[in-house]
Amino acid sequence: MSILNEPQGASAAEDSYENELPVRRKQPGNVVIKWLTTTDHKTIGTMYLVTSFAFFVIGGVMALFMRAELARPGLQIMSNEQFNQAFTMHGTIMLLMFATPLFAGFANWIMPLQIGAPDVAFPRLNMFAYWLYLFGSTIAVGGFLTPQGAADFGWFAYSPLSDAVHSPGIGGDLWIMGLAFSGFGTILGSVNFITTIICMRAPGMTMFRMPIFTWNVLLTGVLVLLAFPVLAAALFALEADRKFGAHIFDSSNGGALLWQHLFWFFGHPEVYIIALPFFGIVSEIIPVFSRKPIFGYMGLIGATIAIAGLSVTVWAHHMYVTGGVLLPFFSFMTFLIAVPTGVKFFNWIGTMWKGSLSFETPMLWSTGFLITFLFGGLTGVILASPPLDFHVSDSYFVVAHFHYVVFGTVVFAMFAGFHFWWPKFTGKMLDERLGKITFWTLFVGFHGTFLVQHWLGAEGMPRRYADYLAADGFTALNTISTISSFLLGMSILPFFYNIWKTAKYGKKIEVDDPWGYGRSLEWATSCPPPRHNFLTLPRIRSESPAFDLHHPEISAIDQLENVGHGEKALAGGKEAGK
């Protein structure tokens, strides 16, 4: 990578010697060896994205089995034991094997490009973190291969359900140690991200010129270092209980509540660990398709810092009904965390306001995220109130809220990010028509599945039950939810077809920025980038270096306006001094 220089755009990559060589078909064995031994952050990012998406499909299939079971009263296709394993592993897979490593995938791919770094700070540690995640997750899911099946005590493993008496199978032990393994990978990855952002920014890339996505990766990394060691310690203590009779989480000495405190001190920051990076993705996409810089850049960063700080003060709102927590404090802090989240909404809507909007597929997914996450946030404010929470705790109202928040953030923003950065990943654009078909089928299927679950919960249907009576009156809404869930599941098919069609027939991108209005630094290098990302780096004078590079006439006007404002302020100061 050269020192600062005025780049030649996409032609710089085309002029390189590598691009003059004849294109050869890679041997499958060479590809496998490359993936097994790589330390390139882009390849590792791709591995994270592919693996996490595979777990997304596996977790989704489990969800469809559960919805098929609940379509009608009576046991249809699963026993109670199988249903317990399904909801335990569905939650575990979606949160810790899909959403968390998906953040690592996007961060690995995009963050070094956005700060002008040639790679991450510790490439081999990066590779090690991925393999810890993969093998840890495989160990946890491997419980399905054991005689008594996988873990069946719910994904938050409440004591005493998770002790050796109530869950004697080896599936529980595999779940505990697999998640500890995988968690170490997440911790090591976050150390890498934080070090890279602090130490490896390009010349001119000050902290307050960093893209919002990079800021969110930094704060997410800090949250991981606060939350995941607590989970690892709690998991080892639980395994000591199960194997060595340590009696740490015995109900007789308050251990059941101790587990809840330890788990939720991890669990609530975890929700923001999987939310903040995807907020960052949306914050990158909306300005590009609004043809405007982000509204309130500093305020958006401040709101993100506030969310990260407050996220470690609200864990016991999961424990209102235990009677063992200070309700006024945790209720107030939970209401309070809605404020910076609301600030973010004003930033996003303010960016779109009076912008030159165009609804290409990434923008469509981002708009779907705004609508869905807003619904989830509103039901979160309801659950923050202890009297209302007492009524709907452990009901389908909580299930609906959680899916609106997590699915609405992670999955909608994931597809937005895929469609937005696919040219950067592969050098080809995903098909717009197929992308819109995927969006509308998923959007309708999702809301049909989970909107009605709010009413089911308010009417009293408990979560995690495999069966209900016809006399309960839950049948109609459950049937609607199940039909919609299969529409939601089918929405993945056009996306897979889109990937295949693009790979086989898509045209090669010849420019650095195929969207035309990209602002951050990844749009100032070729699609896909060279091994160390940049052949030349543009000068970084603002938080939109790629836009300044490709639209110098607009950046020149902005600089003149800034100089004019500065001169007026200076003159005003002199007058005040007189």
UniProtKB/Swiss-Prot annotation:
InterPro entries: Cyt_c_oxase-like_su1_dom, Cyt_c_oxase-like_su1_sf, Cyt_C_Oxase_1, Cyt_c_Oxase_su1_BS, Cyt_c_oxidase_su1_bac. Heme a3 binds at H401. Cu cation binds at H268, Y272, H317, H318. Pathway: Energy metabolism; oxidative phosphorylation. Keywords: Cell membrane, Copper, Electron transport, Heme, Iron, Membrane, Metal-binding, Respiratory chain, Translocase, Transmembrane, Transmembrane helix, Transport. It comes from Streptomyces coelicolor (strain ATCC BAA-471 / A3(2) / M145). It is a multi-pass membrane protein. It catalyses: 4 Fe(II)-[cytochrome c] + O2 + 8 H(+)(in) = 4 Fe(III)-[cytochrome c] + 2 H2O + 4 H(+)(out). Residues 1-21 are annotated as: Disordered. One of its GO terms (biological process) is aerobic respiration. GO terms for cellular component: plasma membrane. This is Probable cytochrome c oxidase subunit 1-alpha. The chain crosses the membrane at residues 44-64, 93-113, 125-145, 174-194, 217-237, 262-282, 294-314, 319-339, 363-383, 402-422, 437-457, 480-500. Its EC number is 7.1.1.9. The keyword Transmembrane helix applies. Binds 1 copper B ion per subunit. Binds 2 heme groups per subunit. Pfam families: COX1 (PF00115). Belongs to the heme-copper respiratory oxidase family.
